[in-house]
């Protein structure tokens, strides 16, 4: 009995989204979070791309405010069925954001300004004919690359949306068959000016990110099946990448010309192909990209496979972690919190936090009761972001993340200006009792004052910890470059 209770305590999550963006008229195909700014870019099945900037502190303040109102208001006055976080519908025709909830719509009419929502539209455009198939940022987030079902690759400025370069990918190939291939994945090098584009025939093309010229092609990697995922293996080399497709994992160097898979009859092939997993390999990531000693892959039958490149050079999985039977793990991203964990998006509408070291699920959050989770990402402060065809949710930081931010700050020379220990349970209880006796207007005023003070301190704490992590990341990147002896982009 005790064991069952412990298991329940581990996986239950009380975290809520701070923002939900919905598309009630067009399917969402892709979403990206800027690495250094509170910016989210969304691609749609209609070919539209929309860029939004959000204010995490304001959105968190709104969520906390609704929580306190629910706690402080008596039962007879409590509002049933009111969503505590902000939910906005994206209008692709005008670019406007509209509240989904009726009560919030009435408040928006009084203010009439998008910035009061904590979210505003920076730009929108009809970028592609047909659907948006894939998107990615460059290493600094200054530009965004997108490819559509029209086979046109476009490079645009992130802040303005203005296209600075474009190319019809079909014009780069001589074969008629290759001209008709559709593209599935984009991946940008973090150290050199090139991007990789995977297609439905198992080919990966290397494109110069400056002039969008074709540099190399690695063909038929997964026996002609579609490329499901591509990611960097820069711990080995700036030119090493991993791709997933069909039931195999492949490991290759983008500089190799006419590279062939190392299969039976061609053992000298330069593309290293894993053993057949007898289950479709849909997505993958390193638990810690800077260490790159553990790789997790999401599978079609609801499990995550664990790979150790230092043990068997990615020939086969080492173990597996059960997530959800008869469901598929469609997307995966590391938490980047030094906790040996990743976030997995599942076809049942849940996102799972999986501890690779313990080999089990440690947290579950529900993204949707009706829609599957088709992509997960992290924002600039490491909030997890989940998305499906109908909506995108930016989740609040968990208590573990907040504690880590505090521990990072306490290691610095600056003294802590605020601590959770300063607030006793008795004080919190007294505040709640006092608030119950106030009118609704007085209650809201008091809550607003408290939240402004709380989130100013939280914002300062988060900014310091994020800045420190980014400095550490840049130092590690420079170290990797020095170790590999890479100084310039010679071979591509």
UniProtKB/Swiss-Prot annotation:
Know the name of this protein?
WD repeat-containing protein JIP5
- Disulphide linkage map: none
What are the UniProt keywords, alphabetically? Nucleus, Repeat, WD repeat
Region of interest called Disordered, as start-end residue ranges on this chain: 404-472
Stored SUPFAM superfamilies: WD40 repeat-like
Give the main localization category.
Answer: nucleus
- Biological source species: Saccharomyces cerevisiae (strain ATCC 204508 / S288c)
Q: What is the lineage of its organism?
A: Eukaryota, Fungi, Dikarya, Ascomycota, Saccharomycotina
Chain segments annotated as coiled-coil in the UniProt record = none
Something else known: Present with 7750 molecules/cell in log phase SD medium.
Tell whether Repeat is among the UniProt keywords.
yes
- Localization: Nucleus, Nucleolus
Each WD repeat, start to end: 127-166, 178-217, 236-274, 276-317, 365-405
């Amino acid at each position: 009995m005790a064991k069952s209770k412990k298991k329940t305590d581990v996986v239950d999550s009380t975290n809520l989204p701070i923002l939900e963006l919905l598309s009630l008229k067009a399917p969402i195909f892709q979403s990206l979070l800027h690495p250094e700014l509170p910016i989210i870019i969304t691609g749609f099945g209609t070919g539209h791309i929309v860029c939004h900037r959000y204010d995490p502190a304001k959105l968190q303040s709104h969520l906390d405010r609704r929580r306190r109102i629910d706690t402080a208001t008596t039962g007879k006055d409590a509002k049933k069925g009111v969503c505590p976080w902000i939910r906005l519908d994206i209008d692709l025709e005008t670019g406007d954001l509209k509240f989904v909830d009726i009560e919030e719509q009435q408040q928006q009419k009084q203010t009439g300004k998008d910035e009061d929502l904590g979210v505003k539209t920076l730009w929108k455009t009809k970028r592609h004919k047909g659907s948006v198939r894939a998107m990615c940022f460059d290493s600094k987030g200054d530009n965004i690359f997108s490819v559509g079902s029209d086979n046109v690759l476009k490079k645009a400025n992130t802040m303005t949306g203005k296209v600075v370069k474009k190319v019809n990918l079909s014009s780069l190939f001589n074969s008629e068959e290759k001209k008709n291939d559709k593209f599935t994945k984009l991946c940008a090098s973090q150290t050199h000016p090139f991007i990789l584009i995977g297609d439905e025939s198992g080919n990966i093309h290397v494109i110069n990110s400056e002039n969008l010229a074709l540099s190399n092609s690695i063909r038929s990697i997964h026996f002609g099946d579609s490329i499901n995922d591509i990611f960097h293996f820069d711990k080995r080399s700036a030119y090493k990448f991993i791709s997933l497709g069909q039931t195999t994992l492949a490991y290759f160097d983008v500089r190799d010309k006419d590279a062939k898979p190392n299969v039976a009859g061609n053992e000298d092939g330069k593309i290293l192909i894993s053993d057949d997993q007898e289950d479709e390999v849909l997505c993958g990531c390193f638990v810690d990209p800077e260490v790159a000693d553990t790789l997790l892959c999401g599978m079609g039958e609801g499990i995550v496979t664990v790979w150790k490149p230092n043990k068997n050079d990615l020939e086969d999985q080492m173990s597996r972690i059960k997530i959800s039977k008869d469901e598929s793990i469609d997307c995966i991203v590391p938490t980047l919190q030094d906790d040996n964990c990743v976030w997995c998006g599942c076809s049942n509408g849940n996102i799972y936090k999986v501890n690779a070291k313990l080999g089990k699920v440690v947290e579950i959050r529900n993204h949707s009761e009706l829609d599957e989770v088709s992509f997960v990402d992290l924002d600039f402060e490491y909030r997890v972001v989940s998305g499906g065809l109908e909506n995108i949710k930016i989740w609040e930081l968990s208590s573990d993340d907040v504690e880590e931010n505090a521990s990072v700050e306490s290691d610095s020379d600056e003294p802590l200006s605020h601590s959770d220990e300063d607030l006793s349970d008795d004080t919190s209880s007294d505040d709640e009792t006092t608030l119950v006796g106030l009118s609704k207007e007085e209650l809201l005023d008091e809550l607003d004052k408290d939240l402004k003070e709380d989130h100013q301190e939280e914002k300062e704490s988060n900014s310091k910890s994020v800045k420190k992590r980014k400095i550490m990341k840049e130092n590690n990147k420079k170290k990797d470059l020095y170790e590999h002896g890479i100084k310039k982009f010679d071979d591509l």
